[in-house]
A protein has these predicted regions:
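Conserved ATP-utilizing enzyme core subdomain
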Residues: 4, 16-40, 186-277, 281, ...
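Short glycine-aspartate micro-motif
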Residues: 3-9, 21, 91-95, 165-169, ...
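Phosphate/ATP-binding catalytic cores across multiple sugar-kinase/actin-like superfamilies
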Residues: 72-80, 265-290
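Non-transmembrane, aqueous-exposed alpha-helical and coiled segments at domain scale
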Residues: 88, 264, 268, 280-287, ...
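Phosphate-binding/catalytic loop of phosphoryl-transfer enzymes
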Residues: 4, 109-114, 121-125, 129-208, ...
Length: 370
């Protein structure tokens, strides 16, 4: 029987919330019926950015931010219901990822932790719909990275029986899925996505992102700085691996800008764009040289300069937006969490040990009944 599920995603780019209403078949095949998006209210975005780092009174602030997120999520759910003409009782579940503010797998005590701010109980109360949340912790408990979780979804949506396909999600952090026609699906975080570019753009232009990559295109890449950025150890660590703003944050960037204080801001932006492009293209070339197509999703797919550089770095591979495959780039991750929620309520495993390094496949998510 076809199930209607809602997926909600607010990623490490911190640009806002994307929501989709999707129809999902028992086989896992799905189609997106409606999409809604809402930027973060500036005060909430500012608080979430601060909570990516240790600070005073952070437990109190985190709890209030989780409540605010739940209310913002509920508003997106209400919009999707209005737009579709559906009632709350028609929806099987909401998959609400939450907002990642810490991601430190396999550290400290050997298990580590991942923390996504969310109040799924409040969201269930406000929406009248079962909510699935906390998708990553179960994989960590099984010895995995807890990320990325979307390669299984990518395989279902973009995989082909006759050729290897690579899928690159460029949100705040970038991650790559390698989908062979036969064999294990692979996936990992490449490193930076939009996070550093967006930070620099906001700092120097007051804009939340570099529209079309036009500002970066106006600058000149600083080769010495780019080489310094590319020396980051994470980039040279073999998969499975995952990262977040714990690593690629403004302090990380400031530490590496020492000696470049006189560089023009647009040149730094050009260099940060080249950094993301090279980190991603190198991973695709090294781990999926046979892929004829690199499908790009997330906000980075809308950055023309980034897409141009990815294509230049992968001349034998067609670099295309997920839009070319019927799924707009800003809808892909939200659709993935609708799909993961459906898996959870059916008690079906959704993690891939070949991706996260976990001891086995696990059912992901915790259910908060309406």
């Amino acid at each position: 029987m076809t199930a209607l599920c809602i997926g909600l995603m607010s990623g490490t780019s911190l640009d806002g919330i994307d929501g989709v209403l999707a129809a999902i078949e028992p086989s896992g095949a799905m189609r997106v019926l409606h999409h809604a998006a809402q930027p973060f209210e500036p005060g909430l975005r500012s608080n979430l950015l601060k909570l990516n780092h240790s600070g005073p009174d952070e437990l109190h602030q985190a709890a209030l931010a989780a409540n605010a997120l739940a209310r913002a999520y509920a508003a997106i759910v209400a919009q999707l219901l209005r737009d579709s003409g559906q009632q709350a009782g028609d929806i099987t579940a909401i998959g609400a990822h939450g907002q990642t503010v810490r991601h430190q797998p396999l550290l400290h005590d050997g298990t580590g932790y991942t923390l996504q701010l969310n109040n799924p109980a409040l969201l269930a109360e406000l929406s009248g719909i079962d909510v699935v949340a906390d998708f990553r912790s179960r994989d960590l408990a099984a010895g995995g990275q807890g990320a990325p979780l979307v390669p299984a979804f990518h395989q279902g949506v973009f995989g082909r029986p006759d050729t290897t396909v690579a899928v690159l999600n460029v949100g705040g952090i970038s991650n790559l899925s390698v989908l062979p026609p036969n064999g294990q699906v692979l996936g990992w975080d490449c490193g930076p996505g939009n996070a550093l570019m967006d930070h620099w753009c906001q700092l120097h232009t007051g804009q939340p992102y570099d529209a079309d990559g036009a500002w970066a295109a106006s600058g000149e890449v600083q080769a010495r700085l780019l080489n310094r950025l590319l020396q980051e150890d994470f980039l040279h660590t073999p998969p499975p691996k995952s990262t977040g703003r714990d690593l690629f944050n403004p302090q990380w960037l400031n530490d590496r800008l020492a000696g470049f204080e006189g560089a023009a801001p647009q040149d730094i932006q050009a260099t940060l764009t080249a950094f993301t492009a090279q980190a991603c293209a190198t991973d695709a070339w090294q781990h999926a040289p046979e892929a004829k197509e690199l499908i790009v999703c997330g906000g980075g797919a809308l950055n023309r300069e980034l897409m141009r550089q990815l294509q230049a770095g992968l001349p034998q591979t067609a670099v295309v937006s997920s839009e070319a495959h019927g799924l707009p780039p800003l809808q892909v991750e939200a659709a993935a969490f609708a799909w993961l929620a459906h898996k959870c309520v059916r008690r079906e495993t959704a993690s891939l040990p070949s991706v996260t390094g976990a001891q086995g496949a696990r059912v992901l998510g915790a259910i908060y009944p309406r």
